[in-house]
Every structure is written in C-alpha cells, then in structure tokens.
Amino acid sequence: MDPALCLELLSFLKPETRADVRAQALEYILGVSGSPEGRQSLCAEPRLLCALLDLSTEQSPHVAQDAHHVLVNLTSDCAAHRALLAHVPTLLPSMLSRLRDPGCPFADSICTALCNLSREEETCQSFLRSLTQEGMCQLLDMLCAPKYNPRASLDYLGPLLCNLTQLPEGRHFILDRNRCVVQRLLPYLQSGSTVRRGGIVGTLRNCCFSHRDHAWLLGDDVDLLPFLLLPLAGGEEFTEEEMETLPPDLQYLAEDKQREADPDIRKMLIETVLLLCATADGRRLVKQRGTYLVMRELHSWEREPCVKRACEKLIQMLIGEEPEAGLENLLEVTVPPDLEETLSRLDKEEEGPQGTLVQ
C-alpha cells in the first residue's frame, strides 16, 4: 500500500473525524490487513499502529471490534512482531490489562492477538517480561475459572500458555511443585474446546522437555501418564493379564469409548509420552503401565499418516533395546547442528502455519 495512502487513512482515524468516516476507514484497513503485503505497509507507519490501539478502546462497539480484528491480523504475521512492539510499546501492557477485565467484550480477540505475538521466542520473552509471575498466576486463574468473562470463551488462553512454556521461565512456573499448576491443568485435557484442549496438551508437552521433573510428573503427586493415555484409548478388549498392567482409569473402558478427535492433539499426546521416555526411569515406568497396549490398538485404528508415524516412534521406544551406556538420557544426547537444523525444518513443515487470522 502506498505510504501516502497510509497517511491519508491516518487522518481519517483521528478522534475529531466523523464516526461514520472513521468506521469506513477502519473497515478498509481491516481488508488491507488480510494480506502479507498489506500488513507490511501498515506496520511501516508507527502512528497508524498507535491509532489502531487507541481505536480498540472506542465506545463504538463496531469500531472497537474492527480495530481488534486488525490487531489480530497484524500479529498473525511473525515478520510484523518486532515492528509492533517497537512502534507501540504500550501494546502488551494495554492488551494484558484489558484481557484481565472480566467484562471486556473483546477478550477473545485480545487473547488471540497475544497468542499470535507469543509464538516466536524473541517476542515471547518480551511478553513474559511484561507479564511477571503475578500475571502468570492471573492467566492461570482466568483459564481455570468457569465463566471468568461471561462475554468470552478465553479458549486461546490454552495456546497462549503453550507458547509461554517454550521458554524455561514459563516452564518453571508451570512445574513449580508448590503451586500445583500441572494438576489444575489436567482436567482440561477433556475440554470441549479443541483450541483449549490442544493448548493444554502443548503446554504439558513443552514441560516434559524438563527431564529432571519426569519422576515427579509420573509419580503419585501428578500421575500424568493416565491423563495422556486416556484420550488415545478406545474401547478395545484386553485379556485379564493385559488389563492388570493398565492404570485403573484405562481399565474396562466402554465399548463405545471415543478417542481424541483431533489428529494434531493425538500427535502431541503421543509426543508427550515419548518425551517421558527420554530417561531410563521414565521408560521403565511408561512400559510398566500398559502404554504399549494402548499404542498397539491406536496404531491399528489410526488413519492419519503423521500420527501413525509418531505412534510407531513410541512403539519402537517401548519394544526396542535400551540405549548404550552414556546415552540413557535421550534429551542430553548431542545432535550434530546440521542434523538438528534439518529435523527442526521438517517438524515446522509438518506443523504448518500457526498464526490465527481474521478472515
């Protein structure tokens, strides 16, 4: 978009402009923000970005809603994150403040924008600095409080929490044994919202990269494994001998027991169990609790190739020989940089784009 047009649009967004003119200009900007080129042009004009943030607090619901939708679109583009935070330093504090308001009608849009902004490590670090420990506690309370905001579902708090746990500081908060955070999240593995459910599974998967916490996660204080396996289990019959190896919550399931419907979530659940197999003690505990039986039946049922491959990796871990001496902890094995880069690229290609855009 022509820079001159950006400046012209900016003049229409001023408070003294007629409300209908301001609304039309904003509607045009919303359309522009739907393309990568449009987002690049908008982010090149700091005053326009500041005006958009101001308009998101407009008294006119239609104007405020469109402004929030533009912000969601802008934050969906990782290339725009640095410019957004540099040009609008009040963006994160302002959004977090409004998200905490239990009466905010645009909380879901704000939550989606914050989720977009926290995807990349650099902006996630900025987010955590703005949030503080107290803010993390508030986010958790909001996620766990039924109807915290009657006007919003706040389902994107799940993926937001997942993004924050890509960093050690975020994982440290979730894994704080004095806060019982993990235990509070486990019921949401059965949430009716795919977005929330997937975010919680992703959070747990990220936390399982901390191998020093595996014994605690698998122990009686958390007992994570049955929560991960139950969504992967169907209603297949097992022999009495096999049944006794399964955790109590997975025994004698109804014949019509349904597995997790979303293939991406099934894949993340399998990957989380695989991470728990990184240490020798973890592998022993996972093997002892009938995990192979659940994976065997899942593999026969599964139709999605990427989930089937993840299942095969875990089965190989469960039935394969133990690693040689010195390689018992698989999370501490050194991977050559070129191989690590290739594997990371393949993972990203398999996952696809993650940003949420308003169409």
Swiss-Prot record:
It holds the Pfam family DUF383. It comes from the Eukaryota. InterPro entries: ARM-like, ARM-type_fold, Hgh1, Protein_HGH1_C, Protein_HGH1_N. Belongs to the HGH1 family. This is Protein HGH1 homolog. It comes from Xenopus tropicalis.
